[in-house]
Amino acid sequence: MSGALTIACVEPQMASRIWPKIRDMIDKGYAAGDNFMPEDIVEGIRYGKILVWIAVDEENGHIHAAMTTELVPMRCGLVCWMGQCAGDRMHDWSKFHVEIEKYAKDEGCVKIILKGRRAWERVLEGFRIRTVQLEKLL
């Protein structure tokens, strides 16, 4: 039986403990964009430069999704980059951005940016397409 999901930010000191459980999820997010997972991602997570967010089953503790965020200074001000995200039971955690928006506001961010598939546009309320990435296979 599956329970309700809770969205939680993993404390950097705890991230190394759960990394084996979420590594493949994070890598799946990179793979969806045809990218390799950066070798230094674990170090960034360990030192709190990159935060990990998880969707956890309240009944059995199973992690159903994982995502990364990173605060980045830009010309407009501090920006929260929503990074790689993957998992299952998306309909149960698709409103995760509300928690991340609260976090970003508390940290003084002026906006949130994410790069992903077009399907995210339907899921993330209030987000709009700002740029387009074009590709041509050779």
Task: Kindly label every feature range from the protein language model.
Residues M1, I45-Y47, G61, M74, ...:
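A generic structural signal for short, solvent-exposed coil/turn residues
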Residues M1-A4, A8-A15, K115-L138:
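Terminal substrate-recognition subdomain of acyl/acetyltransferases
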Residues M1-F36:
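Short amphipathic alpha-helix that is part of the acyltransferase structural core
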Residues R23-K28, E39-D40, W53-E58, Q84-A86, ...:
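N-terminal start-of-chain detector that recognizes signal peptides
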Residues Y30-V52:
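Active-site rim helix/loop that mediates acceptor-substrate recognition in acyltransferases
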Residues V42-E43, E70-V72, K102:
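Short, flexible, glycine/charge-rich loop motifs used to bind or transfer phosphoryl groups or to couple energy/partner
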Residues Y47-M90:
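Conserved donor-binding loop and adjoining core beta-sheet/short helix segment
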Residues R75-G126:
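Acyl-donor binding region in acyl/amide transferases
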